[in-house]
């Protein structure tokens, strides 16, 4: 497959083409097809952008109808029919059933735009500049969001100093027996700790890029209480693990919390169309008209597909229950796999349909597995500080047959990657279930 034009004309910054060195030409559901007709099972989902699969036929039909009717495509922040219907649907499907009140702000098209707006707003509301972020957190690669991102690879590329952020230990950072909330509270209580009082805390309930680190529900509850005690806003970055990835539409719902500000993007449009959104408590809406603008805020094509996604999948609990059923299938399979190779140092963590197979003993193992998986026809990536986590991110709509086939291919890839070092697998069948 000839990739020379990409090598010759595209910047060295390109990344995923190096992991998946083929030319993809088609995609449908959970399958990607390259120019030679080879099929790949997608366990990557555009880094969490395609929760409902590629070219979802329900969304595509509605989008084509809208285009054929000459619906408004570009409208800045003007009132359009597509935006009106989206706002009505958010209110009816997401807010009223939860008895929530949020004001919506449409930012630029990517997740980092939503984070930038959230941080700016928090600083305006509180009149303070410092933000608490967390170890292994990822919030984007533009100025303000990059300052809140912990990964050295991204921070080193900034070229300028990144300030006004204090990093604190995420849940479990020091192990399961250390309460990191108590550590943060001690820092906040001590006037000589050197910690400038923050305007807000920004947190992911599951750190996808950071290595599929999962905050416990109790920790999230305690974090919200901490924010309230110390007059800080709580911002939940739900860009990768929101829109149903953990089983509920918002990833924090199981904790019973209600953040002050929520950022959404990635799978919000449902179709891979750029769209980002900030939800804020109404009393926090202190923006002056036009104070945070952008040419591509409010993507009307994305409004169309996002509305359809909410109506199709989130008008009842049925889809949420289905995601949780698939979570159990994947989790059981991964636990079984980890126990099958007791000397490999494999561990499992995750929530919903973001699950990680962690190579605790040899970080490079995860990348070897990912490469072997791609050779066998599975698109999957790694994450974590040392790329030590094989991150499973299939579409929420993936068919069981395709899901189990992909898992079987990953199992074979694990065996390949370990074959030179590990003894034969001790295959365990938990509860008599087939993997």
From Swiss-Prot:
Keywords: Aminotransferase, Pyridoxal phosphate, Transferase
GO BP annotations listed: ectoine biosynthetic process
Cystine residue pairs: none
Cofactor or coenzyme needed: pyridoxal 5'-phosphate
Residue numbers carrying N6-(pyridoxal phosphate)lysine: 266
Enzyme class: transferase
CDD domains the record matches: OAT_like (cd00610)
Domain of life: Bacteria
Signal peptide: none
MF (Gene Ontology): diaminobutyrate-2-oxoglutarate transaminase activity; diaminobutyrate-pyruvate transaminase activity; pyridoxal phosphate binding
EC annotation from Swiss-Prot or TrEMBL: 2.6.1.76
Record pathway: Amine and polyamine biosynthesis; ectoine biosynthesis; L-ectoine from L-aspartate 4-semialdehyde: step 1/3
Family matches, as Gene3D superfamilies: Aspartate Aminotransferase, domain 1 (3.90.1150.10), Type I PLP-dependent aspartate aminotransferase-like (Major domain) (3.40.640.10)
Entry similarity comment: Belongs to the class-III pyridoxal-phosphate-dependent aminotransferase family.
NCBIfam families (alphabetical): dat, ectoine_ectB, PRK09264.1
Name recorded for this polypeptide: Diaminobutyrate--2-oxoglutarate transaminase
Source organism (scientific name): Bordetella parapertussis (strain 12822 / ATCC BAA-587 / NCTC 13253)
Gene, per the UniProt record: ectB
